[in-house]
């Protein structure tokens, strides 16, 4: 059984990927060990230390880089192999990875009864989120029949937020802190067809395809045109494809299996 070393002194230690690691451990997919808290000087940015990353094996083995940007890479770049969830550092010892919901355990329970039919979804195109980047502008409100952009992101409880998403046929994707946003994956797992906009990334180890899993719009006007022209039959096909991709790549079991698949295909021993 593989071991994953997880730091507990950083943000998001109980949600996103680091919360997902705990669920992997609970299910017996891997052993989870706390990363030792490093000794550092007063002016050190601890998030740049190797001990602030998740690792498979030991520190320095397989880095599981779950930060949004490339500003938290260990200075010595001393790893045997690396997986990149959001922004990606290209190189021989690296691979694109996957992405996941913010609260995987809660999401796993919620999705069971929340994958609605076309007619049971009241919102044609929607978005709900916070203004984490200047790229998230109100310009996009004009193409949505449900649009909430808050300063703090606390408009809904985690369950309330997922309930809102589940009532959308199409979900607008705007860049987050990095080029990917957890919301995009949360759309897919609920059968909401993503509408990708400039600045968003769709790069994953197992790729998603335009016209198969998502639509792509460069402007609000184009988004309106695309969702308006999409037949319910095509929407159903894309919605089903999104759910299938999510289960294989972003569910609790799917993320672990994809992680191991990447390592196997790159001949990386654990």
Describe these PLM feature segments:
Residues 1-212, 216, 248-267:
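Nucleotide-sugar donor-binding catalytic core of glycosyltransferases
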Residues 162, 200, 220-223, 242:
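Catalytic phosphate/metal-binding cores of nucleic-acid and nucleotide-processing enzymes, i.e., regions
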Residues 225-248:
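Conserved donor-nucleotide binding/catalytic region of nucleotide-linked donor-dependent transferases
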């Amino acid at each position: 059984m593989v071991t994953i070393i997880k730091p507990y002194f950083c943000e998001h230690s109980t949600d996103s990927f680091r919360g997902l690691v705990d669920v992997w451990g609970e299910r017996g997919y891997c052993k989870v060990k706390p990363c030792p808290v490093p000794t550092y000087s007063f002016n050190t940015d601890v998030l740049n230390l190797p001990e602030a990353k998740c690792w498979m094996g030991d520190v320095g083995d397989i880095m599981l880089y779950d930060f949004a940007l490339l500003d938290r890479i260990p200075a010595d770049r001393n790893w045997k192999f690396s997986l990149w969830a959001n922004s990606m550092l290209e190189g021989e010892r690296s691979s694109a990875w996957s992405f996941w919901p913010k609260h995987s355990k809660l999401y796993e329970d919620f999705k069971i009864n929340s994958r609605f039919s076309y007619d049971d979804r009241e919102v044609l195109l929607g978005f709900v989120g916070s203004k984490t980047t200047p790229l998230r502008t109100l310009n996009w409100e004009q193409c949505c029949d449900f649009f909430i952009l808050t300063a703090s992101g606390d408009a809904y409880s985690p369950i309330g937020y997922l309930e809102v998403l589940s009532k959308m046929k199409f979900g607008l994707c705007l860049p987050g802190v990095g080029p990917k946003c957890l919301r995009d994956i949360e759309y897919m797992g609920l059968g909401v067809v993503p509408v990708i906009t400039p600045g968003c990334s769709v790069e994953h180890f197992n790729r998603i395809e335009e016209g198969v899993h998502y639509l792509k719009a460069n402007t609000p006007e184009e988004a309106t045109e695309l969702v308006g022209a999409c037949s319910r039959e095509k929407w159903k096909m894309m919605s089903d494809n999104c759910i299938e991709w999510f289960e294989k790549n972003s569910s609790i079991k799917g993320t672990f299996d994809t992680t191991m698949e990447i390592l196997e295909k790159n001949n990386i021993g654990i």
